[in-house]
Amino acid sequence: MFPLYLVRLLYPIGLIANLFFGFAFTLQWFLSERHKRACVPKAFWIFSSIGAILMIAHGFIQSQFPIALLHGANLVIYFRNLNISSSRKLSLKTTLIILAVTLLLTALPFALEAYYHPNMQWMASPNIFHLPLPPPNMYWHMIGCLGLFTFSCRFFIQWCHLEMNNQSTLPVLFWQVGFVGGFLAFLYFIRTGDPVNILSYGCGLFPSIANLRIIYKKSRLSEFHNPSYFISAGEASGDTLGSDLLRHIKALHPDKRCFGVGGPLMRQEGLEPLIHMEEFQVSGFLEILTSIFTLIKKYRKLYKAILKENPEIVFCIDFPDFHFFLIKKLRKCGYTGKIVHYVCPSIWAWRPKRKKILEKYLDTLLLILPFENELFINSPLKTIYLGHPLVKTISNFQHCPSWKQALAISDQPIVALFPGSRPGDILRNLQVHIRAFLASSLAESHQLLVSSYNLKHDQTILDLLEKEGCCGKTVPAMYRYHLMRDCDCALAKCGTIALEAALNQTPTIVTCLLRPFDIFLAKYIFKIFMSAYSLPNIITKSIIFPEFIGGKSDFTPEEVAAAIDILANPKSREKQKRACQTLLETMETNVVTVQECLQTIHSLKSRFHTENDCLGNYVQKNVRPSF
């Protein structure tokens, strides 16, 4: 069809075409390995289309009619995959017409050449390296034609899958047929000594093997989940939430096996511990660093146990950084059960990109703050607002009027201080609190009581009171709600304690004296800039409690004292109490009970139950579980 010198000169077109095919399948393989499922990006079809156009040209130049014809048909299928998701989607009838015209136009030049040159070869063997190979016999040509036909049928299979599911994916049969056809064609072109096609079909075996390997590994997970729940809590607050969750699970499903990670409260409710929660209790950079290998070992133990047991639902309670690693690993290993995270990470304050992780890997997110629902209005993630556990705890609190007598506290009016639970927080915030109290108008008429989170902190508090020349007493943390109910006003460190004060309707001023390094991290690394920082103010979207947050240059004890003087006015205190009542009503609105929540979760199907793009119905019907 073309002069011999031109045939040899243009031979590299086939090599360039294979570079495009190779890049397309390398990209597809890379994304499939990354996501542990067969992914088909749009770029796959674009690069394959360019490769097909070049291979059609190669088929014409090298007088290889089957190559040109099959790649012409494939080109139409590539186009159909690109067109299926466009706004101008063509009908199936139009696509079939395009296919027929393409095949006709491809066959026409060969037909004309055969008419004028009856001795032309329909499948020439270039053998550009002049290897001493005898011409292949009829049986080799039959193997070659069978291989090429089978190999090309994979895209017709994919096309049928595309039209039936209206989704551009590569089903498992695509890879199986591609491997068989590619292997036969590979043998044929070795026999004929055609370097381009040896490279093309030899490299073409790799994507089929790689994707079949991914599918096989994924199919080892049973679609039928065992009637059990995995529940994990890594902190004391999570242990409290987990015990309540377990209590309701056992009420609904008494025979349900629950295993995982939990503390004493969860174990009392029947959790079968794989690891005790106390083993995760590490704090501080050095302690975490020295325990890193132990933590990794525990992490590996957990995800392997979950994959082996294959429970219906995985519940992860708070402790987000560890649980995110676990959740991502489970999904990447093919776990298709429901994953529920209890307590939304503070994405509204910092690291907002964590929202994408939640949406990508979870089925349901259980919320404890009312405004968090607004963060997921247009999200595919199912959210359920359970309410904050403190609301129930404080509503059930029974105030004992004789608590002051038990601690030998006089009936003098009280200003309460809640400087924090950590030694560093106590030293920084308590000094500001004491100086603000002494500078206020209440210093002469009120006594000062400091809530102590731990008995071992009492002496630190008393030493600081003495150093500042202030008389005061410590009150154990178990009496903190009594203290909140009976004080005229409180100074509280920004944190959960501020929400506790609001739910107890305690007139409060929020403070938080930060270290320079903390300020640097907040401003320049984590970029935490908010209109309010304490939960009562965030929830109500108004300033219930005055806030003094920052470094020593941002506020002074005298400014805090001025706020105390405002709260000395009964009208100001009453205004704060009314705002706290509004806060309580907000937090009690649209609350779903744990029992209703569990029923909803149980009724929903996991978003990850069936991976149509990887397994389709094949795995569901043909692959038996290995566990």
From Swiss-Prot:
EC number(s) from the headed UniProt entry: 2.4.1.182
Principal EC category: transferase
UniProt pathway annotation: Bacterial outer membrane biogenesis; LPS lipid A biosynthesis
Entries under SUPFAM superfamilies matching the protein: UDP-Glycosyltransferase/glycogen phosphorylase
Biological process annotations from GO: lipid A biosynthetic process
GO molecular function, one term: lipid-A-disaccharide synthase activity
Keyword Secreted: no
GO CC terms of this entry: membrane
Its biological purpose: Condensation of UDP-2,3-diacylglucosamine and 2,3-diacylglucosamine-1-phosphate to form lipid A disaccharide, a precursor of lipid A, a phosphorylated glycolipid that anchors the lipopolysaccharide to the outer membrane of the cell.
Protein name: Lipid-A-disaccharide synthase
Organism: Chlamydia abortus (strain DSM 27085 / S26/3)
Gene, per the UniProt record: lpxB
